[in-house]
């Protein structure tokens, strides 16, 4: 589209609950309530977008992002900083905006987009996070069929603004976990067509930004499915092989062996790998699994690595999981692919965190929430926050959720809060995150 665009679409409301003075930077004398997403509305008056896709991504994501920043008690300055960063760095790499009948590159973040918002809750407060797959239109028209190039273009921009980002691990791990240009050249057209057809979602990279009050922490997720199909490896061989390739001194080998033994025993394969984009010596590696057998017994088995983790944190965390699982009424049973596609149900997921100097892997469980009414989830979360010394979160959780999905019936909706992740340490207590899906 030739013209540049600004201003809010006519259906965007400005009537959310008011923000406190220090969050908005505005006088408390105003008679009209100040909308939570005032920073979004203000920036919209000054932002020009080069195409309609960036314009649509901004107006789709920024209102909810702005509200989350207010709810997380970010200063007014950081609210504008992080919203501007989204507009200038992230929106340009979200690709063609998906709409009915438009045949564009597909990712499943947030349910149907290339971007997902989430919130982390601890006793110290909440943190807003954004995850996305960098993509450009070339992935939709066949020039970059496996979307290999967009992530590098994004990192070149991110490093200009976020000096703490170190992409050494991106280069080292990409070789082992993603389809490289050399791999693609070595495949004939028949093989390429097969992979393009068999993999409805071709995601190989996802970038996540923790928008902390102390600054941004960047993480990268590597999805080795296409690489494994081309090379004949298992996901576990690819992920643990990649870790060992960069862990030259073997600091993580005993942790890897512990996790690998459980994977072999439980007949589960690694799904993807995550690392912090920092100095490789200080990064955390997280190996993920996704299990369609959604039962508490299976979750317990994975949480304890088949009984291999017997420390106090694991035991206390397991008791909390049992309570949450029962209260939430997690929809159980083996999930067939049709149930995931047609009913939108999700598997259980876990990750196992490893870091040099760490004695044991740290498990984190992702409980699938789709199919459960949003208000029920919110009531359970409110009660949980009250029990675990998070009174501020308990007071506002339900109200905040309704603000994120303004005008939606949360008594009937069952697909907005998609995942609840949980980890536990005695030092910090419960560590929970909610991952949000976009309305259809």
UniProtKB/Swiss-Prot annotation:
Binding locations of dimethylallyl diphosphate: 129, 219, 221, 286, 288, 366, 431, 435
Function: Accepts only dimethylallyl diphosphate (DMAPP) as the prenyl donor but shows broad substrate specificities toward its aromatic substrates. Also shows tryptophan aminopeptidase activity with preference for linear peptides containing a tryptophanyl moiety at the N-terminus.
Binding of substrate, residues: 108, 116, 223
Originating species: Aspergillus fumigatus (strain ATCC MYA-4609 / CBS 101355 / FGSC A1100 / Af293)
Keyword Hydrolase: yes
Chain segments carrying region Disordered: 1-33
Protein name: Cyclic dipeptide prenyltransferase
Catalysis performed (reactions): harmol + dimethylallyl diphosphate = 6-(3-dimethylallyl)harmol + diphosphate; an N-terminal L-tryptophanyl-L-alpha-aminoacyl-[peptide] + H2O = an N-terminal L-alpha-aminoacyl-[peptide] + L-tryptophan; (R)-benzodiazepinedione + dimethylallyl diphosphate = (2S,3R,11R)-aszonalenin + diphosphate; (S)-benzodiazepinedione + dimethylallyl diphosphate = (2S,3R,11S)-aszonalenin + diphosphate
Family, as annotated: Belongs to the tryptophan dimethylallyltransferase family.
Domain of life: Eukaryota
Name of a matching Pfam family: Trp_DMAT
Keyword Protease: yes
Alphabetical keyword list: Aminopeptidase, Hydrolase, Prenyltransferase, Protease, Transferase
EC number: 2.5.1.-, 3.4.11.17
GO biological process: alkaloid metabolic process; protein prenylation; proteolysis
GO molecular function, one term: prenyltransferase activity
Polar residues: bias regions: 20-32
Family annotation (InterPro entries): Aro_prenylTrfase, Aro_prenylTrfase_DMATS, DMATS-type_fun
